[in-house]
């Protein structure tokens, strides 16, 4: 089945995420920077990297290798244009993370924010395990159900409405259970709340199973 993400221009996606009533771009970039500061990985992968939101906050003297993975080739092309010169250790891949990930060396830290709402979680967790070093960390962000906001927020960027039918919220407990089954040990969880009323669960897992 064709991914809905292939039909959304990057400008629309970034514009939507930056709309004040949505406010998710700044939240996700800030969280990415915080997690990098917490774990100080020498290598990191961003799943669903789009145009590189938060890549400007990377400390390349600490995180020397950065892997970006996205299903949309236009997103990857724009990310390369923006950051290839600024991040010497940048590796970019056009991949469907629901398929086995091949020829990508494992990393110390994986950031998968607002990814699991659009994929089958368990197979993706298995694929992410293959690119996470033993002892490495997987950080996830899940959107939680809301009585006050629709899953895909209203904005002038109508192409985003195409995501509505593809989106399915995942409970943090279900993700943690799937993660444990494939070899990711639960470390922590916390809640983020935006002014729009939307809430997000931030979870961290450690790859422990050989």
PLM features per residue range, with description:
Residues 1-39:
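Class I SAM-dependent methyltransferase Rossmann-like catalytic core
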Residues 118-131, 140-142:
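A short, conserved alpha-helix within the catalytic core of class I
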Residues 98-110:
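A short acidic, Gly/Pro-enriched loop at the edge of an enzyme's catalytic core
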Residues 43-99:
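Class I SAM-dependent methyltransferase SAM/SAH-binding core
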Residues 137-170:
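Conserved class I S-adenosyl-L-methionine
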Residues 164-183:
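Short alpha-helix
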Residues 108-122:
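A short SAM/SAH-binding and catalytic strip from SAM-dependent methyltransferases
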Residues 182-210:
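Core SAM-dependent methyltransferase catalytic element
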């Amino acid at each position: 089945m064709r991914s809905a993400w292939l039909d959304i221009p990057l400008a629309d996606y970034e514009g939507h995420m930056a709309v004040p009533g949505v406010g998710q771009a700044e939240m996700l970039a800030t969280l990415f920077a915080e997690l990098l500061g917490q774990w100080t990985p020498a290598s990191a992968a961003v799943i669903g990297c789009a145009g590189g939101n938060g890549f400007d906050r990377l400390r390349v003297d600490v995180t020397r290798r950065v892997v970006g993975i996205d299903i949309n080739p236009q997103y990857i092309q724009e990310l390369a244009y923006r950051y290839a010169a600024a991040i010497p250790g940048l590796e970019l891949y056009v991949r469907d993370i629901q398929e086995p990930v091949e020829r990508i060396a494992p990393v110390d830290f994986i950031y998968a924010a607002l990814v699991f709402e659009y994929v089958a979680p368990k197979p993706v967790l298995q694929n992410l395990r293959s690119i996470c070093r033993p002892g490495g960390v997987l950080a996830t962000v899940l959107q939680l159900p809301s009585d006050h906001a629709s899953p895909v927020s209203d904005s002038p960027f109508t192409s985003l409405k195409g995501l509505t039918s593809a989106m399915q919220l995942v409970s943090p407990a279900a993700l943690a259970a799937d993660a444990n089954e494939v070899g990711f040990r639960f470390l922590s969880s916390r809640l983020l709340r935006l002014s729009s009323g939307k809430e997000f669960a931030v979870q961290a897992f450690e790859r422990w199973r050989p």
